[in-house]
Amino acid sequence: MLTWLTRDSLTFPPLEKALHDPNGLLAAGGDLTPERLVAAYRHGCFPWYQDGQPILWWSPDPRTVLFPEELHISRSLAKFIRQGHYQVSFDSDFPAVIEACAAPRDYADGTWITDSMRAAYCELHRRGFAHSVEVRREGELVGGLYGLAMGRLFFGESMFSRADNASKVGFVALVEHLKQAGFVLIDCQMPTNHLHSLGARAISRAEFADHLARHLDQPSGASWVR
């Protein structure tokens, strides 16, 4: 049975209570306050829903993640990066990145990044939890991604690309940055061919929860000014 959250409690049900079909649906309802969102990521779930639906909270099993030391950069991508087509920055324009991620895609109907989601994550950015990667070509924003950093874990949310390899260049820069700062895992949530090509793989929900328990409260050396 699906658990419905109330606005007066930040408690989520145990992850093992998530439904098998649809895979990982853990709870519904609640709100998108910064406190609830932080509690959700610390618990191992994330919001994902369409306009017109209640807020839905997910903890899929298996979970797609990338360990920084397993980043795979193809020869062609490595050559492209060396050619220096793009300039990469962190946290220089979070609102523009999430707006671009929310824009309609040719291959999808609508977007799951609603206006309320954008406002909520911009507030998390102001509070120092959410961070962005900007990829520019001659000053124009052509790619990027955003997510949350907690302890030594990074929770990826969405990425976009308006030019060849732009999101891949941004992702590689993020992984290298996180690796240097001592991060141990990047949560990619759901599988995609794009992420698998960069080294992401599936782990069990139990293994993911173990990483949360061990690394959420460990300090990292990440600096988000670049």
Curated annotation (Swiss-Prot):
User: Could you name the domain of life of the organism this protein comes from?
Assistant: Bacteria
Function of this protein? Functions in the N-end rule pathway of protein degradation where it conjugates Leu, Phe and, less efficiently, Met from aminoacyl-tRNAs to the N-termini of proteins containing an N-terminal arginine or lysine.
**What GO annotations for molecular function exist for this entry?**
leucyl-tRNA--protein transferase activity
Where found in the cell? Cytoplasm
Any one GO CC term of this protein is:
cytoplasm
Which species is this record about? Pseudomonas entomophila (strain L48)
Q: Which family does it belong to?
A: Belongs to the L/F-transferase family.
What EC number(s) has UniProt assigned to this enzyme?
2.3.2.6
* UniProt keyword terms in alphabetical order: Acyltransferase, Cytoplasm, Transferase
Lineage of the species this protein comes from: Bacteria, Pseudomonadati, Pseudomonadota, Gammaproteobacteria, Pseudomonadales
Q: Which reaction does it catalyse?
A: N-terminal L-lysyl-[protein] + L-leucyl-tRNA(Leu) = N-terminal L-leucyl-L-lysyl-[protein] + tRNA(Leu) + H(+); N-terminal L-arginyl-[protein] + L-leucyl-tRNA(Leu) = N-terminal L-leucyl-L-arginyl-[protein] + tRNA(Leu) + H(+); L-phenylalanyl-tRNA(Phe) + an N-terminal L-alpha-aminoacyl-[protein] = an N-terminal L-phenylalanyl-L-alpha-aminoacyl-[protein] + tRNA(Phe)
Q: Where does the UniProt entry say this protein principally localizes?
A: cytoplasm
Q: Name one GO biological process term.
A: protein catabolic process
Write the protein's name: Leucyl/phenylalanyl-tRNA--protein transferase
